[in-house]
Every structure is written in C-alpha cells, then in structure tokens.
Amino acid sequence: MLWSCAYTWHPTTTVQQVRGRILQQDEAGTNLPDKMRGWYDLVGGGAGFLLIETEDPGEINAFCQPYMDLMDWDVRALIPQEYRAAIKRFRKEV
C-alpha cells in the first residue's frame, strides 16, 4: 500500500533541527529509505510530503513519531487510479 505522509513544520522549527533529526534517524535505520517512493518539499519550505510503500501501517507510525516534536503529520493511504479505466467506469455509473 502507498501512503502519503504530508508534513508541516511547527512555527519554531528550524532547518538545522530538521536536518539533524533526519541524519539521526538515518543513523538509527528508521527512515525507511528502501520503502520511500518519493520525497517532495513544497516551494517556500517548511512543508512537503513523502510517499512510502508498506503493507504495515505500524511502520508509518514508527517512521513519523520521532519527528512529531518538530512537525505535524497528515498521513493517508492512497488508492491508485488508472485514468482511462476510471473514465470508462464513470460513464457507466453516470
């Protein structure tokens, strides 16, 4: 399953804190680099999202928790859609 993990830094969070925490968690082996399918920052900084693929939602919790003092998370499971198949289905349903 693919998960969107959107983050927004707390107002007092600094770039040094975030970079330090990322390095700390990388050294601890908890950043799930093999399961990350994308890492995107929003223009302007302080927010972005990661795409993580795992069947275990507990892995998402374990990934996000060490960052919760620095940022808020909005985590959602994603359902893939194939455009042409969706349009065909919509035409039948409408």
Task: Please annotate each region the language model reported.
Residues 1-94:
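Conserved, structured core segments of small domains
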